[in-house]
Swiss-Prot record:
UniProt keyword annotation of Ribonucleoprotein present: yes
Organism of derivation: Oryza sativa subsp. japonica (Rice)
Name by which UniProt lists this protein: Large ribosomal subunit protein eL30
GO molecular function: RNA binding; structural constituent of ribosome
UniProt keyword list: Ribonucleoprotein, Ribosomal protein
Keyword Metal-binding applies: no
Length: 111
């Protein structure tokens, strides 16, 4: 029961930090633009939803490994990730180029 509360709190924490990035930072949504930012070494953090297709997930992880970028696996499906971003559509993956006022890169790197 304690572990469930901890994951709920960490999920809420990530959601709040993600909303702050959406307001004050720079980001890209979608598979093609995430790969483009990884190839150009512009991404600082990549977030992947829980139900991202395995081939896409492995390709993003490969490019992130080459670019030495942290990959965070979101504990929800693509609908939840889209809602956390404040969008009304599904988001499979997103890359954060500039976190703005948020410290999401530090907190996801520790986990």
């Amino acid at each position: 029961m304690v572990a469930a509360k901890k994951t709920k709190k960490s999920t809420d924490n990530i959601n709040n930090k993600l909303q702050l990035v959406m307001k004050s930072g720079k980001y890209t949504l979608g598979y093609k633009t995430v790969l483009r930012t990884l190839r150009n070494s512009k991404a600082k953090l990549v977030i992947i939803s829980n139900n991202c297709p395995p081939l896409r997930k492995s390709e993003i992880e490969y490019y992130a490994m080459l670019a030495k970028v942290t990959v965070h696996h979101f504990h929800g499906n693509n609908v939840d990730l889209g809602t956390a971003c404040g969008k009304y559509f599904r988001v499979c993956c997103l890359s954060i180029i500039d976190p703005g006022d948020s410290d999401i890169i530090k907190t996801t790197g520790e986990q």
